[in-house]
Amino acid sequence: MFAVLKTGGKQYKVQAGDVLRVEKLAADAGEKVQFNDVLMLGGDAPVVGAPLVDGAAVQAEVIDQIKGEKLIHFVKRRRKHSSQRTKGHRQKLTLVRITEILTSGADKTGVKAATGQAAAGAAAPAAAAPAAAGSDDLTKITGVGPAAAKKLVEAGIGSFAALAALSDEQIAAIDAVKVKPEWVEQAKELAQG
């Protein structure tokens, strides 16, 4: 039995046991992923989707995250200009081994769906959640922009009271951003109300 699946804008004809190099997926080595975009199932009774086969899926195990071979992009302006540029590129890929082709019941398996690079986007809201709990808007202090406020929150200083309570040694120990004495004075005023 074989299946035609779609991932990363490409289509692959696969069987159980095949090893594929697909566009980078948000999964670590050893994890199981499921491709839900199945265009066709083949075998004794072929099924062609319109455009997808309902309930069908292909499960795979992630072997490794790799880079493809280097592609050289060479640009040369001929004749009077005599300029040239060479750039190389190695595409990020995921190596997967097909373990199973499901003809039905794909939504009940509990295996996570294979998606692109969503790991970085998922981490950003998780980092913003601790900042929202019991913190002040540090950008109200003159000279503290959004980037400096974010670095202060990452250093554990998320409120005016925490910034006002810093000693000179603690201020010197903060490497992420240079805390100015005016910031501490303004934080004391804002913490009092």
Curated annotation (Swiss-Prot):
Please name the SUPFAM superfamilies in this protein's record. Answer: L21p-like, Rad51 N-terminal domain-like
Against InterPro entries, the record matches this protein to: bL21-like, bL21-like_sf, DNA_repair_Rad51/TF_NusA_a-hlx, Ribosomal_bL21
* One Gene Ontology biological process: translation
One Pfam family for this entry, by name? Ribosomal_L21p
Q: Does the keyword Heme apply?
A: no
Q: What is the superkingdom listed in this entry's lineage?
A: Bacteria
What name does the UniProt record give this protein? Large ribosomal subunit protein bL21
Q: Does the keyword ATP-binding apply?
A: no
User: From which organism does this entry originate?
Assistant: Ruegeria pomeroyi (strain ATCC 700808 / DSM 15171 / DSS-3)
Segments traversing the membrane: none
What this chain does, per the record?
A: This protein binds to 23S rRNA in the presence of protein L20.
Q: Which GO terms describe its molecular function?
A: nucleotide binding; rRNA binding; structural constituent of ribosome
State a GO cellular component annotated for this protein: cytoplasm
| Similarity comment | Belongs to the bacterial ribosomal protein bL21 family.
According to the record's subunit comment, the protein's assembly and interactions are: Part of the 50S ribosomal subunit. Contacts protein L20.
Keyword terms of this UniProt record: Ribonucleoprotein, Ribosomal protein, RNA-binding, rRNA-binding
